[in-house]
Amino acid sequence: MKHIFILLIRFYQRFISPLKPPTCRFYPTCSHYGLEAIRRFGALKGGYLTIKRILKCHPFHPGGFDPVPEKEQK
């Protein structure tokens, strides 16, 4: 499942994103954030973090630097 999400994001980055002007108000961009979150936390938690990030991407949020959280050491 993790690989399917990664493929979907890579498809978006390669074929859809170049057609739109750059509008992401965050660094890293939402798609890069999603890739890193899914690679670090897996499909469920990484997908949750990605959706949460995308929901913050609107004109009323200041944006800025918003990295993927570090994985907690047990």
Curated annotation (Swiss-Prot):
Do you know which Pfam families this protein is assigned to?
A: YidD
Location comes to: Cell membrane
One GO CC term of this entry?
A: plasma membrane
Coarsely, its chief localization is membrane
UniProt entry tagged with the keyword Glycosyltransferase: no
Q: What does this protein do?
A: Could be involved in insertion of integral membrane proteins into the membrane.
Q: HAMAP family from the xrefs?
A: UPF0161_YidD
- Indicate what this protein is called per its UniProt record: Putative membrane protein insertion efficiency factor
The organism named in the record is Anoxybacillus flavithermus (strain DSM 21510 / WK1)
